[in-house]
């Protein structure tokens, strides 16, 4: 039996694997009609093999879902990978990690260099989890890569499928004042009136336990796309694009840890 904390949970709102300018597949892949040739079903955690490889995959899943607990030396807040890559990286339009190993090595404009999957994961720990780089041979890094590869085992490299990346929204201007009302009505019940969340299950949205200002989720457009399709968790997709932009602007206006690469080596 798979322990409960290894099951694919539905999380609440750190963008991890973010090639290109920010999100995993940016926002060019909005919701579309299902195509039998490109549909994908998440593998059952019960099928993770026994033995050393399976142990590494299971550790990677644990790190993914409760990063501060299972990768504590490398984390500087209370964010987990699964807070943005929902359902353990399997939820459509919640930046699923399936297929990610096949995208690397990749050239990234921000770094102006080709980076490996391990380097990209390190950047996520630095920016989204306000932490430090993991050694490539650490149990935690090997586990995360093993989990991503296992999750992608039935996905043809480079083949598109519905649900990748984030939902495509029109480009709008968010209003933090309007967003404060949306937040109070739709978000505060889970994330709290002061954005503190309920870690580890529900993430903080601002303050010392939330992502830094160097994280992908700190970009209003990306957060709006994530929120509109996935939140509130009890009624996802119920917010209009404008409401999503407004609440993203409100969260963006709140304090976040300042990201300085020199402090997160």
Locations of the language-model features?
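Post-cleavage N-terminal segment of exported redox proteins
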Residues: 2-63, 67, 105-177
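Sequence/structural segment immediately N-terminal to covalent heme-attachment motifs in c-type
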Residues: 52-90, 170-198, 220-222
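Secretory-pathway/luminal and periplasmic proteins that interact with or process carbohydrate-rich
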Residues: 70-73, 88-94, 151-156, 198, ...
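Amphipathic alpha-helical interaction segments
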Residues: 79, 83, 139, 143-146, ...
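A structural motif
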Residues: 114-118, 148-160, 189-199, 216-223
């Amino acid at each position: 039996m798979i322990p409960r904390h290894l099951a694919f949970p539905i999380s609440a709102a750190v963008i991890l694997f973010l090639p290109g300018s920010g999100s995993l597949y940016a926002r060019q892949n909005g919701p579309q009609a299902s195509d039998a040739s490109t549909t994908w079903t998440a593998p059952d955690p019960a099928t993770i093999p026994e033995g050393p490889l399976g142990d590494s995959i299971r550790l990677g899943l644990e790190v993914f879902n409760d990063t501060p607990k299972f990768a504590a030396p490398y984390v500087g807040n209370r964010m987990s990978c699964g807070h943005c890559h929902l359902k353990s990286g399997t939820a459509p339009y919640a930046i699923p990690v399936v297929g990610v190993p096949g995208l690397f090595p990749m050239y990234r404009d921000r770094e102006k260099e080709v980076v490996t999957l391990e380097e990209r994961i390190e950047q996520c720990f630095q920016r989204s989890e306000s932490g430090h780089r993991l050694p490539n041979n650490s149990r935690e890094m090997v586990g995360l890569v093993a989990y991503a590869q296992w999750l992608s085992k039935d996905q043809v490299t480079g083949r598109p499928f519905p649900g990748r990346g984030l939902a495509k929204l029109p480009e709008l201007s968010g209003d933090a004042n309007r967003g404060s009302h949306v937040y109070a009505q739709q978000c505060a019940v889970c994330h709290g009136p002061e954005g503190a969340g309920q870690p580890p299950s529900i993430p903080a949205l601002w303050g010392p336990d939330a992502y830094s200002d160097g994280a992908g989720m700190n970009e209003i457009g990306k957060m709006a796309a994530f929120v509109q399709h996935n939140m509130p968790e009890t009624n996802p997709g119920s917010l209009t694009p404008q409401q999503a932009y407004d609440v993203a602007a409100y969260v963006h206006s709140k304090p976040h840890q300042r990201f300085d690469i020199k402090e997160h080596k």
